[in-house]
């Protein structure tokens, strides 16, 4: 496997920071806007199963804050992220690495724990870290649950999205 190209200024870095802030602040709308279509569909399906409603009634959740289902749909993901990153107090303590470009439609960033003062760190300083994967769709980089799990496993890193149930 070819090593991914590193890019130090990439839209995924801001997207990852925005997503982590949204998780920390329990901002369901901001979280939803950063998720890929596939991830949104998975969460809508999970919501439909939990709520015992037909899938067509669970689909099409709007991120505008007016959709009453939004909080319930993203709650399992938020709980998983908070648990995987070590609790609500630790979620805001992660930095974001430069982006690694796997291919034209896939990139990831590492979520790095707080090191204190700024410095060059070794792999031993940041492992185990977490990897957050993005797919490029509709002209933006969006977090993808499946790619995050797959790439985290390949890198032998814990999945920051946890086990969403």
Model regions and ranges:
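Short, low-complexity N-terminal intrinsically disordered segments enriched in polar/charged residues
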Residues: 1-25, 29-49, 57
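Surface-exposed, charged secondary-structure patches
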Residues: 2-7, 51-123
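Short, structured coil/loop segments at alpha-helix boundaries
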Residues: 9-10, 36, 63-67, 139
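Short, surface-exposed loop/turn motifs at beta-strand boundaries within globular domains
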Residues: 12-14, 24, 89-92, 104, ...
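Solvent-exposed, non-transmembrane amphipathic alpha-helical segments
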Residues: 39, 51-55, 63, 154, ...
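Low-complexity, intrinsically disordered terminal/linker segments enriched in charged
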Residues: 102-165
């Amino acid at each position: 496997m070819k090593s991914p190209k590193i890019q130090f200024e990439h839209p995924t870095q801001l997207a990852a920071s925005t997503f982590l802030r949204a998780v920390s602040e329990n901002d369901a709308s901001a979280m939803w806007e950063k998720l890929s279509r596939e991830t949104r569909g998975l969460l809508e399906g999970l919501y439909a199963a939990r709520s015992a409603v037909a899938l067509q009634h669970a689909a099409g959740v709007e991120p505008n804050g007016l959709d009453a289902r939004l909080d319930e749909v993203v709650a399992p993901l938020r709980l998983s992220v908070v648990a995987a990153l070590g609790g609500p107090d630790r979620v805001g303590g992660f930095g974001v690495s430069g982006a690694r470009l796997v291919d034209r439609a896939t990139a990831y960033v590492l979520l790095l724990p707080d090191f204190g003062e700024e410095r060059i760190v070794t792999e031993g300083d940041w492992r185990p870290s977490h990897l957050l994967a993005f797919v490029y769709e509709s002209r933006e980089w969006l977090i993808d649950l499946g790619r995050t799990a797959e790439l985290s496993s390949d890198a032998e890193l814990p999945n920051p999205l946890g086990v969403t149930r």
